[in-house]
C-alpha cells in the first residue's frame, strides 16, 4: 500500500512538472524579471520600472525589476547571459553595455544578447555655465581650436559621458582636457564651482538648471530636437555630427526564441498610443524611442561599432 | 523657529500623512533592528509603492523608513552585538558589552535619546542653514575631499592605539580589500581573478554580516555562553540626566561630524559613526574604557549616524546631489513625479520642501517614543534560548546579504568574512580599523586621483589651497599625537609589568 502511494505521488510529481512545461509553451505564464543594470532610484531604474509596469498591464503577468548595479552593470549582464532563454529573465540597459565591452570591463559582447526593443531615449546635452562667453557650439569649437587642451570637460572615466566627450572631440576636431568629475550631480557642482568649463547633462536636468538661470545648453546630441526642450538646438543643426543618446534597450539572453521576442516587442509597440505611458516617460526626462526587433538589432550593432571606433581612436580599447 | 513650526503644523494637520510617516517609522525601526536589513533596503522596497501616491505622501512613508532605519540599528547592536545596519557598527563596540554587563536598558535608552538628538538637530540645521552649507560645498574640489579623507584615515591610528601593529595591519587589510573591483578612475579591473561578481567589489553589507552576525552567532553557539542576567526595569529616562551634561562636548562634536560627513556626497551614516567613535575615543580621558561598555562610545556613534540624515538631505534638496545611498533613492522617488531637486525646488515646491522638514522632525519624535515604549520588550530578546534565536538570525543574515544586491555571490562573501572575523579574533586583530580602511580607502583613492587629473599631476595644490593645507596639518597633528599616545601607553604597560 505504501509503495503504491509512493509511486502514485511520484507520478503526480512528474505530471506536475510536465504540466509546468506545457504551461511554459504559452508565454508568458509566470513572473518576468527585468534585470536593471543600475541602482534603484536613478533615471535608468525609473525608466525600467515604468516599462515593467506597462508590460505587466499588457502581458497580464507580474513583471518585476531586479537592480544589479554591480560592476557598472557587468553583474546584471552576466546574470542575463547565464539565464535560461525562456523570456523570464530580461536585461534593461543602454549605451553603457557597449562601453563596458570595449573598455574591457566585461568580456562578453552585447551582440551576444538577443535584442528585443528599444524603449525610451534620454537625450544628452553639452552644457556650460551661464557665465561662459560661449553662446553656441561653434563659439566653443572656435575657441577650443585656438586653445587646444585648455578647456576642461567633466566626465566619468569609462562611462557613457566619457564617450560623449570623445564624440565631441572627434566630430569637432578639437582637444579638450577630460577630467573625471563623477556622476551627473557632482559634475553640476564642479561646473558651478568653476572647476569645469563643460559638462554633459541630460535634457531633463539641463532644463531645470537653464530655467534657474545658472546653465547654458550649447547642443543636444541628437538628430532632432527633444520634445521636452524644443528650445535647445541640436549639434547636427549646428553642423556637427554628434549623435549620442542613451537609448534604453531591452535584451533577452542569447538564443531567446523569436516568438517570445515578438510577444514582448508587440506589447511595447502598443504603448505609443498610451498617453499615460508617454507622460510618465516625460516626467523623468525620457522620450518615446521604440524600435522593432529588426531595427533594434541594426541599431545595437551600429552603436556597438561606433563606440568601438571611438575607443580605438582614443586608445581606450582593451 | 517659525519655519519648522509651520512645517510641523502642516504635517500634523494631515492625518493620512501622519499615518504614513508612523507606518514608515515602524517599518524603518524593524528594518534597522534586523541585522542585514537596512534603511536603504527598506526605502528601496517601499519606493515603488510611492509611485502611486502624491510626492508629499510618498515622502512621508520614505522619510519615516529612513529615520526609523538609521535609528533602529542600535537595537540589534546593543542586544546582540550585531549592527542592525552599517550605520551602527561603532555602536556594537560599547553598547553590546554594556548590555552583557546586565544594563541593556541603559544602553538602549542612550541609543534612543542620542538618535533623537541627532535627527532633530540635523533637521534644524537643514531648515536654517542648508543654503549656506551648500554654497561651501561648491567651493570644495577633489583636493579638499582627498585631504579630508586622508585626515579621516589617520583615525585608524587612534582605533589601533592599544595594539599598534595589529591595528594598523587590520587597517591596511581593509584598504587592500577596498581596492577589489573596478578602479575608481581609469576603470581597470583589480584583483577580480576573472570573476565577474568581483568586478562589483566586495559588498560592505555582506562583509559586515559575516564579520559580526555569522561570526558572533557561530562563536557564541560554540562557546555556549550563558544567558546574561538582565535588569529590565526602566526608571525615568533609563540613564542619569547628568550624563548628557558630562557628554555635552562629545555629543556636539559627534553631531558636527555626522552632519558634515552626511553632507559630503557619497558618504553617509555608515562612515559617520566610525569617525565619531574614533574621535570620541581619541579625545576621551579614559580611552582604555572604550570597547568595554563606555557610554561615551554609544553617544558618539548614535548621535553622529542620525545627524548624517539631515546632513545628507542638505545637498539633495538644495543641489540635487544625494549625500548617501538613501537620499539617492529619495531623489528617485521625487524624480518619478517629475520633480527634479535642485536650486528650483525651494521656489517651485515650497509645500513639498516644508513637509519634508516637518516629516523629518516628526519621524524623530515618533522613533523616540516607539523606542521608549519598546524598552521593556526589546531586552527580552536576550532571554530567548539561543537554539531558537540563532537560526532566525542566521536566515535573516542570508536574506540581508542577498537583498542589498539581489546577488547570491554575496553569500560567499559573507561566509568568507565570518571566517576572516574568527581568524582576526584569534590573532587579536581589531575589526574597526579594517572596516574604516575598507570604506575610506576607495574614497581617498578616487578623490586623490581625480585631484591629480585636475592639476595635471602636480601635488602642489594640496599645500597651496588653504582648506586642503589646514586639513593636511590636522592629519599630521593627529598622526603625531597618536604616536605619542601610543608610546605613552606602551611605556605605561611596560611600567605595569615591571
Residues covered by each model-derived region:
Chain A
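Hinge/capping helix and adjacent helix->loop/strand transition within the periplasmic-binding protein
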Residues: 30, 82-88, 101-186, 247-280
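N-terminal (or domain-start) structured segment
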Residues: 24-112, 150, 157, 161, ...
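Short coil/turn segments
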Residues: 39-41, 95, 129-134, 155-160, ...
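C-terminal lobe and pocket-closing loops
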Residues: 121, 205-273, 302-305
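Beta->alpha turn/N-cap motifs
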Residues: 91-97, 155, 183-184, 201-206, ...
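Immediate post-signal peptide segment of exported/extracytoplasmic ligand-binding proteins
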Residues: 22-34, 62, 83-89, 141-152, ...
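A ligand-binding cleft/hinge motif common to bilobed small-molecule-binding domains
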Residues: 95-105, 162-171, 197-230, 308
Amino acid at each position: 500500500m505504501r509503495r503504491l502511494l509512493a509511486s502514485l505521488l511520484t507520478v503526480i510529481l512528474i505530471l506536475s512538472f510536465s504540466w509546468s512545461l506545457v504551461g511554459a509553451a504559452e508565454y508568458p505564464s509566470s513572473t518576468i524579471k527585468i534585470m536593471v543594470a543600475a541602482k534603484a532610484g536613478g533615471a535608468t531604474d525609473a525608466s525600467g520600472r515604468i516599462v515593467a509596469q506597462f508590460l505587466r498591464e499588457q502581458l497580464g503577468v507580474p513583471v518585476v525589476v531586479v537592480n544589479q548595479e554591480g560592476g557598472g552593470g557587468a553583474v546584471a549582464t552576466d546574470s542575463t547571459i547565464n539565464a535560461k532563454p525562456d523570456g523570464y529573465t530580461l536585461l534593461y540597459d543602454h549605451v553603457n553595455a557597449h562601453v563596458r565591452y570595449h573598455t574591457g570591463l566585461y568580456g562578453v559582447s552585447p551582440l551576444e544578447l538577443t535584442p528585443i526593443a528599444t524603449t525610451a531615449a534620454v537625450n544628452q546635452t553639452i552644457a556650460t555655465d551661464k557665465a561662459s562667453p560661449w553662446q553656441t557650439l561653434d563659439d566653443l569649437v572656435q575657441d577650443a581650436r585656438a586653445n587646444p587642451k585648455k578647456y576642461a570637460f567633466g566626465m566619468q572615466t569609462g562611462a557613457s559621458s566619457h564617450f560623449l566627450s570623445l564624440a565631441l572631440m572627434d566630430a569637432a576636431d578639437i582637444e579638450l582636457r577630460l577630467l573625471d568629475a563623477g556622476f551627473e550631480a557632482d559634475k553640476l557642482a564642479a561646473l558651478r564651482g568653476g572647476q569645469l568649463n563643460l559638462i554633459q547633462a541630460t535634457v531633463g536636468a539641463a532644463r531645470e538648471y537653464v530655467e534657474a538661470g545658472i546653465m547654458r545648453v550649447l547642443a543636444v546630441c541628437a538628430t532632432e530636437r527633444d520634445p521636452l526642450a524644443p528650445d535647445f538646438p541640436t549639434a547636427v543643426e549646428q553642423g556637427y555630427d554628434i549623435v549620442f543618446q542613451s537609448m534604453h534597450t531591452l535584451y533577452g539572453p542569447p538564443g531567446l526564441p523569436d516568438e517570445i521576442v515578438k510577444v514582448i516587442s508587440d506589447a511595447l509597440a502598443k504603448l505609443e498610443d498610451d498617453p499615460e505611458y508617454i507622460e510618465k516617460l516625460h516626467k523623468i526626462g525620457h522620450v518615446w524611442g521604440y524600435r522593432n526587433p529588426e531595427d533594434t538589432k541594426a541599431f545595437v550593432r551600429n552603436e556597438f561599432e561606433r563606440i568601438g571606433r571611438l575607443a580605438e581612436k582614443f586608445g581606450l580599447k582593451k | 523657529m517659525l519655519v519648522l513650526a509651520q512645517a510641523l503644523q502642516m504635517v500634523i494637520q494631515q492625518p493620512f500623512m501622519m499615518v504614513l510617516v508612523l507606518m514608515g517609522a515602524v517599518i524603518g525601526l524593524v528594518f534597522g533592528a534586523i541585522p542585514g536589513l537596512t534603511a536603504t533596503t527598506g526605502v528601496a522596497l517601499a519606493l515603488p509603492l510611492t509611485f502611486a501616491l502624491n510626492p508629499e505622501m510618498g515622502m512621508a512613508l520614505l522619510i519615516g523608513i529612513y529615520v526609523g532605519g538609521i535609528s533602529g540599528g542600535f537595537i540589534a547592536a546593543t542586544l546582540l552585538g550585531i549592527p542592525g545596519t552599517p550605520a551602527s557598527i561603532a555602536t556594537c563596540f560599547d553598547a553590546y558589552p554594556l548590555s552583557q554587563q546586565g544594563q541593556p536598558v541603559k544602553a538602549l535608552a542612550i541609543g534612543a535619546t542620542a538618535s533623537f538628538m541627532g535627527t532633530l538637530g540635523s533637521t534644524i540645521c537643514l531648515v536654517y542653514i542648508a543654503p549656506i552649507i551648500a554654497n561651501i560645498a561648491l567651493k570644495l574640489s577633489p583636493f579638499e575631499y582627498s585631504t579630508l579623507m586622508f585626515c579621516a584615515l589617520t583615525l585608524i591610528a587612534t582605533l589601533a592605539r592599544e595594539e599598534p601593529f595589529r591595528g594598523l595591519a587590520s587597517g591596511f587589510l581593509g584598504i587592500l580589500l577596498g581596492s577589489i573591483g573596478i578602479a575608481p578612475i581609469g576603470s581597470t579591473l583589480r584583483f577580480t581573478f576573472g570573476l565577474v561578481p568581483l568586478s562589483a567589489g566586495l559588498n560592505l553589507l555582506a562583509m559586515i554580516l559575516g564579520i559580526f552576525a555569522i561570526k558572533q552567532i557561530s562563536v557564541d553557539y560554540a562557546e555556549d555562553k550563558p544567558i546574561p542576567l538582565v535588569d529590565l526595569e526602566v526608571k525615568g529616562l533609563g540613564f542619569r540626566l547628568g550624563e548628557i551634561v558630562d557628554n555635552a562636548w562629545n555629543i556636539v562634536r559627534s553631531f558636527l561630524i555626522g552632519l558634515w560627513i552626511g553632507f559630503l556626497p557619497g558618504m553617509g551614516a555608515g562612515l559617520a559613526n566610525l569617525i565619531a567613535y574614533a574621535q570620541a575615543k581619541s579625545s576621551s580621558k579614559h580611552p582604555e574604557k572604550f570597547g568595554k561598555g563606555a557610554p561615551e562610545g554609544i553617544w558618539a556613534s548614535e548621535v553622529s549616524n542620525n545627524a548624517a540624515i539631515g546632513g545628507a538631505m542638505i545637498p539633495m534638496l538644495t543641489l540635487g546631489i544625494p549625500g548617501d545611498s538613501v537620499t539617492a533613492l529619495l531623489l528617485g522617488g521625487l524624480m518619478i513625479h517629475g520633480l527634479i531637486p535642485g536650486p528650483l525646488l525651494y521656489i517651485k515646491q515650497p509645500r513639498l520642501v516644508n513637509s519634508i522638514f516637518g516629516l523629518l522632525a516628526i519621524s524623530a519624535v515618533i522613533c523616540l517614543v516607539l523606542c521608549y515604549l519598546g524598552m521593556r520588550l526589546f531586552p527580552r530578546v536576550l532571554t530567548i534560548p539561543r537554539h531558537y534565536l540563532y537560526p532566525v538570525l542566521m536566515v535573516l543574515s542570508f536574506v540581508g546579504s542577498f537583498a542589498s544586491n539581489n546577488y547570491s555571490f554575496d553569500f560567499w562573501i559573507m561566509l568568507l568574512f565570518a571566517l576572516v572575523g574568527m581568524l582576526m579574533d584569534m590573532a587579536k586583530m581589531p575589526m574597526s580599523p579594517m572596516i574604516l580602511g575598507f570604506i575610506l580607502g576607495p574614497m581617498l583613492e578616487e578623490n586623490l586621483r581625480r585631484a591629480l587629473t585636475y592639476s595635471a599631476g602636480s601635488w602642489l595644490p594640496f599645500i597651496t589651497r588653504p582648506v586642503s593645507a589646514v586639513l593636511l596639518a590636522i592629519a599630521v597633528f593627529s598622526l603625531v599625537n597618536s604616536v605619542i599616545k601610543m608610546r605613552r601607553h606602551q611605556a605605561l604597560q611596560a611600567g605595569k609589568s615591571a
